[in-house]
Amino acid sequence: MSGHNKWSTIKHKKGAADAKRGKIFTKIIKEISVAAKLGGGDPAANPRLRTAIDKAKGENMPKDNIERAIKKGTGGMEGVVYEEIVYEGYGPGGVAVLVEVMTDNRNRTVSEVRSIFTKCNGNMGEAGCVAWMFDKKGVISYDTSLDFDQLFEAALEAGAEDVVEEDEQIEVYTEPSSFIEVRDALEAKGFKFQSAEITMIPQTQVALEGKQAESMLKMMDRLEDCDDVQNVYANFDISADEMEKMM
């Protein structure tokens, strides 16, 4: 069940995260507002909202920004109405790509996303064309300085599906329905997580190199740079040696 964070690892190496902090805030604020609208403004009774708030705190978002986003979602403040859509398609080399968006203008967004696919040697597909290649899972990441055996035992006892160590992290995998329960149970035992999210994990990966690898990274960058895009998932793999050539 490994490999879900390939793009995150690459972004970290490229040093791209800090440069896009403003866009990260915008995306999290959208998620908080939509979560509050759908499930109410109480994080204790709304797991999706609680997860979004935790992510905001992890990015050091000011408390006032979080509270305003919740109020916009619950109707306490005037705000934009967003629609959630998932676009699917193929990148270079036949890589499967899922794009989650929140938009107030469906026509504008689909035009932007389709343009990015086309310019990066990919193409958009019909709904359902690649979604079956991914599994929705909770992923909780920890520093490798923690005792793996202790974390492994505690995680399985709390209801986790699997625990693996890779890319200088220990990752605990859960079903989406037990994600919050497992995360909180481990935190109560002193295991502080670095990140925690519900994400889409590819069942298989497509190895890329050369021009295809460059085009795929360009596609990921441009999609994430799109204001309406919340998350991008793709089942590509680029070796460390290949990354060194492109850096």
Swiss-Prot record:
The keyword Hydrolase appears for this protein: no
Biological process per Gene Ontology, one example term: regulation of DNA-templated transcription
Matching HAMAP family: Transcrip_reg_TACO1
Entry-linked PANTHER family: TRANSCRIPTIONAL REGULATORY PROTEIN YEBC-RELATED, TRANSLATIONAL ACTIVATOR OF CYTOCHROME C OXIDASE 1
Gene Ontology cellular component list: cytosol
Membrane-spanning parts: none
Keywords: Cytoplasm, DNA-binding, Transcription, Transcription regulation
GO molecular function, one term: DNA binding
Organism: Trichlorobacter lovleyi (strain ATCC BAA-1151 / DSM 17278 / SZ) (Geobacter lovleyi)
Pfam families: TACO1_YebC_N, Transcrip_reg
UniProt-recorded name of the protein: Probable transcriptional regulatory protein Glov_1245
Compartments (UniProt record): Cytoplasm
NCBIfam families recorded: PRK00110.1, PRK12378.1, YebC/PmpR family DNA-binding transcriptional regulator
Keyword check for Cytoplasm: yes
InterPro entries registered for this protein in UniProt: Integrase-like_N, TACO1_YebC-like_2nd/3rd_dom, TACO1_YebC_N, Transcrip_reg_TACO1-like, Transcrip_reg_TACO1-like_dom3, YebC-like
Similarity comment text for this entry: Belongs to the TACO1 family.
